[in-house]
Every structure is written in structure tokens, then in C-alpha cells.
């Protein structure tokens, strides 16, 4: 079960599920929705914030490199 604090695991899941997406161009609203739609995500959608989303995005960019 993924929670917002699992930023690296979320990034890996996003990379595996959406290899066609370049994460550096994903805005935070879309990123939030992509995370919420992950099969293993089970946290409160309202608990996300800019710091968490930025961490997910940076980890996703690193995974893609």
C-alpha cells in the first residue's frame, strides 16, 4: 500500500506504468491525479502538498534517466 510519504516507490510505479510520459513536463495537478490512480495507492488524496509532489516528480525524473 502506497502512501504520500513513499515518494521513491510512487515514482518507480509511475515510471513503470507511464514510460511514455516525460515527468519534467507534468504539472502538480496532473501528477497528483496520476498518483491517486495508481493501483497500490491507499492514502487520503487531500494529504498531498507541493513538497511531496515535487519529491515524487524529482524521483520520477531520476528513474527515467
Q: Where in the sequence are the language-model features?
A:
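A charge-rich, low-complexity, intrinsically flexible signal that marks solvent-exposed coils, linkers
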Residues: 1-65
